[in-house]
């Protein structure tokens, strides 16, 4: 009998005998390929699974997402085993992450950094034993007896409908999980405990506080070293560190999660906003301003109160709340007058301030805040225009992200098990999204069944300079909200029709996007966006009047040009240049006798210099800002 095996895109037809174990096939046909995971007919499985005729087998090494997930899940089991051996704690949950793994435990004392060496030593002992991962199916009642002293595992078991539940053993250690796993603990060749923190069971503050221990592992030490170098680079580029050095913003205990933007930070914020405003005009968006406070009935009508109330800031003693999103306000605007098909698509953009009641433990610099603004837009359109509007949204996205040299990928999420509307409506909407993606020259990954109940969506995952994957943009179809607000427009036949809403954000929150920019560019933000575009450096005190002349000329051409002056007579020229460099000035203009005599400016970028006439320099600066291109020497 034969099967089809796929590895790294290459399909091979292989003849096998009855009862063949997949590991035997791998040893024979894929030696030295470091296969660590597999899928049989699209379902992830253990490598020691028996295979049958006509099955489709996919093999994965550590270079694949599937392989990494299995590898890190198995590493979490090794961590859990070590923690039980050391501390006799109660295990809760130990999943794989996009990068690494963690295990939550219930323990009487906190795990501190000084404990990491002991944990790593015990993990290494387990790894050195090269213990097999063995799967066993256990009856639910028997498993409840096995975990009778662990309320957390009992909770998970009781939420599993099946009577037979999979458990994985490593010698005497066992842990309930679906798997699959790598063959044995010895395949983990390099690992590190990263950090520990506290968390709540099931993420609810009403539940027990747990300890969460994070780790990372790799099949060789070279990959671990590369990871550590990447982490070190991320620390050096941390937006919290650079933001402080550039004096862009700060936070205060009197308003946790709400940023105090300083003048230079406001420059970046406003330039991003003005850039989008100009794009909105080109693309037919109408900017609106909606209230910050609404009666709670609005959030009940929209459905947000029922599903989102813990994140809504209410006003004590009043039936009002700060808005966490703009869409209900835009629905009120749409409904304020009778609408015709001639007005559609109607594109509302809103930079309004939003508040979300994030728990204090999750607040992280600019990436997780309570007060923020975003490039929020809602497009009210007919079903027939969905594809065109999605294409426009993707084109908008491409324009913006290309300016920042960001790579991205698209994920299409389709109809879930529970959904609003008809299957026919969903099929048409999903086809519109697929066609729009393809016609715009993009590819996509299908997340089948992962759409919201009110409509399919496109998630845009941005890759930053450290190749971290971050979601900022989203394009979401919504059949539900127009129905909740009873939105109507008159179609060509004079009949009332319900519009579709497209929720759309490109940058997402300005706070988070600025954090990404800082961590991608450091102090060297794009020239057009930078608050310190030009540093004026005088060689001597006698050149200060000329410096003010140059400054005035610059501001006459670009009113909001970010200029810093370095004139301290106690500083040498080299020290002034160094200060301007450390301040992040994109170009440094040195002014001395020669420049003053010839009405010129000596421009320095890094270690390169060039002399310009003032008029020539100003034109070059102006063009650089208008085109969003870097200022470079020709």
Swiss-Prot record:
GO BP, sorted A to Z: threonyl-tRNA aminoacylation
Cellular compartment(s): Cytoplasm
Keyword Cytoplasm part of the UniProt annotation: yes
Record EC number: 6.1.1.3
Alphabetical keyword list: Aminoacyl-tRNA synthetase, ATP-binding, Cytoplasm, Ligase, Nucleotide-binding, Protein biosynthesis
Domain TGS: 1-61
GO molecular function ontology, one term from the record: ATP binding
Family matches, as SMART domains: tRNA_SAD
Short name of one Pfam family: HGTP_anticodon
Enzyme superclass (EC): ligase
Catalytic activity line of the entry: tRNA(Thr) + L-threonine + ATP = L-threonyl-tRNA(Thr) + AMP + diphosphate + H(+)
Annotated GO CC locations: mitochondrion
Family of this protein: Belongs to the class-II aminoacyl-tRNA synthetase family.
Name of the molecule in the record: Probable threonine--tRNA ligase, cytoplasmic
């Amino acid at each position: 009998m034969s099967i089809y095996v796929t590895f790294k895109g290459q399909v091979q037809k292989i003849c096998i005998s009855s009862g063949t174990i997949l590991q035997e096939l791998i040893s024979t046909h894929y030696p030295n390929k470091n296969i660590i995971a597999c899928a049989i007919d699209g379902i992830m499985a253990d490598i020691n699974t028996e295979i049958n005729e006509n099955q489709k087998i996919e093999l994965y090494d550590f270079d694949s997402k599937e392989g990494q997930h299995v590898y890190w899940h198995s590493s979490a089991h090794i961590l859990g085993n070590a923690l039980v051996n050391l501390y006799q704690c109660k295990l809760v949950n130990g999943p794989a992450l996009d990068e690494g793994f963690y295990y939550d435990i219930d323990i009487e004392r906190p795990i501190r950094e000084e404990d990491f060496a002991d944990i790593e030593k015990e993990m290494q002992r387990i790894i050195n034993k090269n213990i097999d991962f063995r799967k066993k199916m256990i009856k639910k009642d028997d498993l409840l007896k096995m975990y009778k002293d662990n309320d957390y595992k009992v909770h998970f078991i009781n939420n599993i409908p099946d009577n037979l539940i999979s458990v994985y053993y490593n010698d005497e250690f066992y842990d309930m999980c679906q798997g699959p796993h790598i063959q044995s603990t010895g395949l983990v060749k390099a690992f590190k405990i990263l950090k520990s923190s506290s968390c709540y069971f099931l993420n609810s503050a009403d539940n027990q506080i747990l300890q969460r221990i994070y780790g990372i592992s790799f099949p060789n030490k070279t990959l671990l070293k590369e990871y550590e170098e990447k982490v070190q680079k991320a620390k050096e580029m941390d937006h919290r560190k650079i933001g402080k050095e550039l004096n862009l913003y700060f936070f205060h205990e009197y308003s946790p999660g709400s940023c105090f933007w300083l003048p230079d930070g406001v420059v970046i914020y406003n330039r991003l906003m003005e850039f989008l405003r100009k794009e909105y005009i080109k693309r037919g968006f109408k900017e609106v301003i909606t209230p910050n406070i609404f009666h709670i009935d609005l959030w009940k009508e929209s459905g947000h109160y029922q599903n989102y109330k813990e994140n809504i800031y209410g006003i004590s003693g009043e039936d009002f709340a700060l808005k966490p999103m703009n869409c209900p306000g835009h629905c009120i605007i749409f409904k304020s007058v009778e609408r015709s098909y001639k007005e559609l698509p109607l594109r509302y953009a809103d930079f309004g301030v939003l508040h979300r009641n994030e728990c204090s433990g999750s607040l992280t610099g600019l990436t997780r805040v309570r007060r923020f603004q975003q490039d929020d837009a809602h497009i009210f359109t007919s079903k027939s225009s969905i594809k065109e509007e999605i294409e426009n949204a993707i084109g908008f996205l491409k324009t913006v992200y290309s300016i920042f040299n960001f790579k991205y990928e698209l994920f299409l999420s389709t109809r879930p098990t529970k959904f609003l509307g008809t299957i026919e409506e969903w099929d048409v909407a999903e086809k519109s999204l697929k066609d729009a993606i393809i016609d715009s020259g993009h590819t996509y990954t299908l997340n089948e069944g992962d759409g919201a109940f009110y409509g399919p969506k496109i998630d845009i995952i941005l890759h930053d300079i450290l190749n971290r994957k971050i979601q900022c943009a989203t394009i979401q179809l919504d059949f539900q909200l127009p129905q909740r607000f009873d939105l109507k427009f008159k179609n060509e036949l004079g009949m009332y029709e319900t519009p579709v809403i497209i929720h759309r954000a490109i940058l997402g929150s300005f706070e988070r996007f600025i954090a990404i920019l800082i961590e991608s560019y450091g102090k060297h933000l794009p020239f057009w966006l930078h608050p310190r575009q030009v540093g004026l450096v005088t060689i001597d005190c006698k050149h200060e009047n000329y410096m003010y002349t140059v400054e005035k000329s610059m501001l006459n051409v670009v009113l909001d040009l970010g200029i810093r002056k370095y004139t301290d007579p106690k500083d040498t020229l080299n020290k002034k240049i160094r200060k301007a460099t450390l301040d992040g000035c994109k170009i440094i203009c040195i002014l001395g006798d020669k420049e003053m005599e010839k009405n010129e400016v000596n421009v320095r970028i890094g270690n390169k210099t060039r002399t310009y006439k003032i008029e020539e320099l100003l034109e070059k600066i102006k063009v650089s800002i208008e085109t969003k291109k870097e200022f470079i020497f020709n």
